[in-house]
Swiss-Prot record:
Documented EC number(s): 1.1.1.130
Catalytic residues of the enzyme: 44
Protein's name in the database: 2,3-diketo-L-gulonate reductase
Classification via HAMAP family: Diketo_gul_reduc
Domain of life: Bacteria
Job of this protein: Catalyzes the reduction of 2,3-diketo-L-gulonate in the presence of NADH, to form 3-keto-L-gulonate.
InterPro entries the record matches: Diketo_gul_Rdtase (IPR023689), Mal/L-sulf/L-lact_DH-like_ah (IPR043144), Mal/L-sulf/L-lact_DH-like_NADP (IPR043143), Mal/L-sulfo/L-lacto_DH-like_sf (IPR036111), Malate/L-lactate_DH-like (IPR003767)
Residues bound to NAD(+): 168-174, 224-225, 304-306
Family matches, as NCBIfam families: PRK13260.1 (NF009750)
Length: 332
């Protein structure tokens, strides 16, 4: 089915208001969920909203909580999220990283006791739109086996890197081949994954999203490389925030909350003039996109460039929402 941005935001807003969330907070949170969906990231927008409400109902998310600054060391700050709403707090932390970068050239905010930030790419994009390089990542509950194991002991720990090119170039990637949200998107659409995304119960690589969702044997991105990167991202986020590691979140909490996150902004224009910056970025992009195509019908793409097109399409044609997901939201 198709819905408009306004319909989607209003549906989110009403569910939040029904649960006693303050009007201003509910409006801001609903807006972020709707914008994520409008950008084409259904897995962490409309599809994720029922799960978000479940955690709100369980008390994992404290909607009235406000993040507090704990430590300030020039370009580096440490904050405690107080288990506040994840996407609103993440937006504030990237804003703060940009403020620090304006003073120091680079700003780093380490956040502990946070909730799921939904679409991590929103915060990298937020920085790139204002001319900064945006880098951020989060740890999570253990939802992926480390390389060589069958049991989940590491997080998917998504990493985002956004560059202020025209259009914005952005990598937003889980340390698994696919996020669990994308497994759900493909399962709901009745599609196999385009490449192997995990192991079946017999230990064979599989493209069946439902099998991987059930047995949790999701495949690390790049096999042992994604496994290793997940581990070191967790270590850095834990140390800089003095927060919880994947091990602590998994063993000590009843669900995925109280995670650790990193937000970095770099003010490029302190290091290079605007005309030179734009020319260098354009040369990089042109060099890549003019490569001979492996398939004449498929263009060479740069990461994140599809979001501008998806946004235009959804604004023009309406936002596609799975019927079963919409029914869940209407029932909340």
């Amino acid at each position: 089915m198709k819905v408009t941005f306004s319909q989607l935001k209003e549906a989110f807003n009403q569910v939040l208001l029904k649960r006693g969330v303050a009007a201003e907070t509910a409006d801001a949170c609903a807006d972020m969920f709707a914008r994520t969906t409008e950008s084409g990231v259904y897995s962490h927008g409309v599809n994720r909203f029922p799960r978000f409400i479940q955690q709100l109902d369980n008390g994992d998310i404290i909607p009235e909580a406000k993040p507090q600054r704990i430590t300030s060391l020039g370009a580096i700050e440490q904050w405690d999220a107080q288990r506040s709403i994840g996407n609103l707090t993440a937006k504030k932390m990237m804003d703060r990283a940009m403020e620090l970068a304006s003073d120091h050239g680079i700003g780093l905010v380490a956040l502990r006791n946070a909730n799921h930030w939904m679409r991590g790419g929103s915060y990298g994009w937020q920085a790139a739109e204002k001319g900064y390089i945006g880098i951020c990542w989060t740890n999570s509950i253990a939802v992926m086996p480390p390389w060589g194991a069958k049991e989940c002991r590491i997080g998917t720990n998504p990493l985002i890197v956004a560059i202020p090119s025209t259009p914005i170039t952005m990598v937003d990637m889980s340390m698994s081949m696919f996020s669990y949200g994308m497994l759900e998107v493909n399962r709901l659409a009745g599609r196999e994954l385009p490449v192997d995304g995990g192991f079946d119960d017999e230990g064979n690589l599989t493209k069946e999203p439902g099998v991987i969702e059930k047995n949790r044997r999701i495949l690390p991105m790049g096999y042992w490389k994604g496994s290793g990167l997940s581990i070191v991202l967790d270590m850095i986020a834990t140390l800089l925030s003095n927060g919880s590691s994947v091990a602590e979140v998994t063993q000590e909490n009843s669900d995925e909350y109280g995670v650790s996150q990193i937000f970095i902004a770099i003010e490029v224009d302190k290091l290079i003039d605007g005309a030179t910056r734009d020319a260098k970025l354009q040369r990089i992009m042109d060099f890549i996109t003019t490569a001979e195509r492996a398939d004449e019908n498929v263009a060479v793409r740069l990461p994140g460039h599809e979001f501008t097109r998806l946004l235009e399409e959804n604004r023009r044609d309406g936002i596609t929402v799975d019927d079963s997901v919409w029914a869940k939201i209407q029932a909340l």
